[in-house]
From Swiss-Prot:
This is Rsm22-cox11 tandem protein 2, mitochondrial. The lineage of its organism: Eukaryota, Fungi, Dikarya, Ascomycota, Taphrinomycotina. GO terms for molecular function: copper ion binding; iron-sulfur cluster binding; methyltransferase activity. The keyword Iron-sulfur applies. It holds the Pfam family Rsm22. One of its GO terms (cellular component) is mitochondrial matrix. In the N-terminal section; belongs to the methyltransferase superfamily. Rsm22 family. In the C-terminal section; belongs to the COX11/CtaG family. It comes from Schizosaccharomyces pombe (strain 972 / ATCC 24843) (Fission yeast). Residues 592-753 are mitochondrial intermembrane. Signal peptide: none annotated. Residues 1-39 form a transit peptide. Specific enzymatic cleavages in vivo by mitochondrial processing peptidase (MPP) yield mature proteins including rsm22-2 and cox11-2. The record marks 568-569 as: Cleavage.
Length: 753
């Protein structure tokens, strides 16, 4: 098979991976009263089956086997963004928050937000520390869980997933995990999802209320969600008597609690003594701020220096992730002035309890967790870096490469979001020689290499060398601002301004904050040139004076004229915009009615009973989920209140869902109301099928009566096959109640649109 054909084939299979369904990893995400189950498969088994056919073709054409490097870059390294806590954890924390005093929780949540804002504004030299859970009250613990638990879980899940990719041996060993991080054993929860069932789990926590939460989560809730649960042991302090006993030690959000550098180093020594000498791992994770990265950087330097000072080979150590080297960190923020840090992001779905005590306008369903971390392995030295193993084009990628843990540890890592430009991609990496490199991968480097560069993400390993490279010097990595004495002010002094030549054009020249017009100066220059031979001294000095003083007067006049012109233009624009806005206000209602009558926007009632059969109510799991949001309104003359009991529900095409509205009569007499509904966008209304609802029916409510109104619906499976629905991810279901009015014959007079 020709090489060009192989290249196109591998590109086709690479794009084909987006068409397969995820099936293995379970992730439960609740939205309101409805819990939806998503299935994901991180191994892309279907893509492997297709790649096996391509490998057979390569073998038959006497070419090496398909590159495992390509397999790694295509599927193994891609991280899932659909991370969320289990439903039972969410319900448990939600129940704790609702039982507590709302005022205290909101106060402590605001205090945490203020501390986070203060941390980002303070310089590194200013003292700052987080409050330890040891001194927290019960409402403070709940406020911390509300603010930090989803973010901390997403960060640790991403770190452990990356650790499993880079160091594949960690999943094969017997796991003895020690979680001494801040919170209710979040590191242990993340390890359950990434690694096989560990042999033993220990959690360090002193707070009595937090210990109770840990017991409930890890002994009562977690065993019901796992086929092979592990009951953890809760400890009051670090088990310093069990040195070299744990294969994985996790400390998240703990370094910011240290008051001094001595306390920080003592804590690191204690953690390091608990790590097993036979390849044990220490995971340190902090918030992705300047202070958090600074602590991670100091801990990294301290532990590496500690291992170098000992002659015992059992205490050898090296960085597993994210650094591909054991040298000095090239990002030096303590001696610089830029907020240039090594941090990463992880997308995740917010838990329902995270939306409590949050204004409605600030509620979101997902967010990103910023974190800085380091993973250090004890007792094993870093494998030698094979500097000749570099990949530059498609031919190198198609070669047979054995992707193993020693190889992955020396690969460069992307430390900033790739800049995807037209025709090329700019990727900044931290390389194995402790330098920052900028790789530029253009289209001319190869279609496969360019495609992989376009699909690369922040935090990925990237072994490709760009066609164009620039390396930062090891002595000065960060850019420093110029000294204040050498910077220019807004209006620089005259000696810094360019000179105004005699033979300039009539166009104005912009220098600093001054506009120079040279029309009059040009006319005077001609007169001076004509008479300069008669009175050379006079005209020479007068000419110089005019260049300085006369031109300034001209520039001032020009500035005033330009200011008045800009002022008049601005007024004209404001008047025109005001008239247009006023006219648009009067024309909005008829224009909207005309638009709805022509396009069908506003929803169409689906009365075809043949589309309500059970065959259409089968979820199509191979399609994306659609967010259905709810809204309730009443007419101005109706003394009712109408609101949805849930804000949103995520459903698949063909999946049935049940929602509830609550209607309340706030008046002192009985009222009969009739509801109508609206679907936005209107083109999706034909696929929105309601099996049962309360619209177009008379609803009588007694004085001060409150009732629940159900809505049972599903989205027709043909929604997924319609190309016009391709970009529709959100559907709004809105109900409006009107007061029912009758004529003398008892017929309903209320107009429903």
């Amino acid at each position: 098979m020709p090489i060009l054909t192989c290249r196109y084939k591998i590109l086709f299979l690479y794009n084909l991976r987006n068409c397969f369904t995820f099936q293995n990893q379970r992730c439960l995400i609740p939205y309101g009263t409805t819990t939806t189950i998503r299935w994901y498969n991180a191994n892309f088994q279907a893509v492997q089956n297709n790649f096996s056919d391509y490998k057979n073709e390569l073998i038959s054409s006497h070419r090496p086997e398909a590159s495992s490097l390509l397999d790694f870059l295509v599927k193994d390294q891609k991280k899932s963004g659909d991370i969320s806590l289990h439903t039972k954890f969410n319900l448990y924390v939600d129940d704790l928050l609702k039982k507590s005093e709302k005022g205290q929780i909101k106060k402590f949540i605001n205090d945490i937000k203020k501390d986070l804002a203060t941390e980002s504004q303070l310089p590194l030299s200013a003292p700052f520390k987080d409050e330890s859970t040891r001194t927290m009250t019960d409402p403070q613990v709940l406020a911390y869980i509300h603010q930090s638990m989803p973010y901390q879980y997403a960060s640790l899940y991403s770190v452990l997933t990356d650790l499993k990719i880079v160091n594949s041996d960690v999943s094969c060993k017997s796991q003895h995990i020690l979680d001494c991080g801040k919170g209710p054993g979040i590191g242990a929860l993340a390890s359950y999802s990434v690694f096989p069932t560990p042999n033993s789990v220990s959690i360090v926590e002193e707070n009595p209320f937090l210990k109770k939460i840990i017991y409930d989560i890890h002994h009562n809730i977690y065993p019901s969600t796992s086929p092979n649960p592990t009951s953890p042991v809760t400890l009051n302090r670090l088990p310093l008597g069990k040195k070299d006993s744990y294969t994985l030690v996790i400390a998240s959000n703990k370094l910011l609690e240290m008051k001094s550098e001595k306390e920080l180093f003592d804590y690191l020594r204690s953690l390091w003594s608990l790590v097993s000498n036979d390849g044990g791992l220490l995971v340190l994770c902090e918030r992705g701020t300047k202070r958090g990265f600074s602590l991670i950087q100091r801990a990294r330097t301290f532990l590496l220096q500690k291992s170098k000072n000992t002659s015992d080979k059992q205490f050898n150590a090296h960085i597993v992730a994210p650094c591909p080297h054991d040298g000095r960190c090239p990002i030096d923020i303590e001696n610089g002035v830029r907020a240039n840090i090594c941090s990463f992001k992880q997308h995740f779905f917010l838990s329902p309890f995270s939306r409590l005590y949050v204004p409605r306008s600030h509620r979101r369903s997902s967010d990103r967790s910023h974190y800085s971390y380091v993973v250090i392995q004890k007792g094993i030295t870093r494998p030698l870096n094979n500097t000749t193993q570099r990949f530059k084009n498609d031919e190198d990628l198609l070669e047979n490469v054995n992707v193993t843990s020693p190889t992955l540890k020396n690969w460069p890592r992307i430390i900033r979001p790739p800049l995807k430009r037209d025709g090329h991609v700019i990727i900044d990496v931290c390389d194995s020689d402790a330098r920052l490199r900028r790789n530029i991968v253009p289209k001319s480097q190869g279609k496969l290499a360019y495609r992989l560069a376009r699909k690369s993400a922040w935090g990925d390993l990237f072994p490709l060398e760009g066609k164009v490279q620039s390396t930062s010097p090891s002595s000065k990595i960060t850019k420093h601002l110029k000294d204040a004495s050498s910077t220019y002010s807004i209006n620089p002094p005259s000696y810094n301004k360019p000179k105004v030549e005699r033979n300039t054009t009539a166009d104005p020249i912009f220098v600093g904050k001054r506009f120079y017009s040279t029309n009059r100066h040009k006319a005077f220059s001609r007169f001076a040139d004509f008479n300069s031979h008669r009175f050379p001294c006079i005209f020479t000095s007068f000419s110089c004076y005019n260049c300085i003083s006369g031109t300034r007067n001209i520039s001032r006049q020009y500035s005033r004229d330009k200011f008045h012109y800009n002022q008049r233009t601005t007024i004209y624009y404001l008047v025109a915009i005001s008239i247009f806005a006023l006219g648009l206000t009067y024309a909005a209602v008829p224009l909207y009615r005309l638009f709805c009558s022509k396009t069908g926007y506003g929803g169409t009632l689906n009365t075809d009973q043949s589309r309500m059969n059970a065959e259409r109510m089968v979820p199509r799991k191979d399609n994306k989920r659609i967010r259905v949001t709810f809204n309730g309104d009443v007419a101005g003359n109706l003394s009712w209140k109408l609101w949805p009991q849930q804000r949103e529900i995520y459903v698949l095409p063909g999946e049935t869902a049940l929602g509830f509205y609550t209607a309340e009569n706030t008046s002192d007499h009985d009222i009969v109301g009739v509801a109508t509904y609206n679907i936005v966008p209107g083109q999706a209304a034909v696929y929105f099928s309601k099996v049962a609802c309360f619209c177009f029916e008379e609803q009588k409510l007694d004085a001060h009566e409150k009732v629940d109104l159900p809505v049972f619906f599903f989205i027709d499976p043909e929604f997924a096959d319609d190309p016009n629905m391709k970009d529709i991810d959100d559907i709004l279901l809105s109900y409006t109640f009107f007061e029912a009015r009758y004529d003398t014959n008892g017929n309903l007079l209320t107009k429903l649109n």
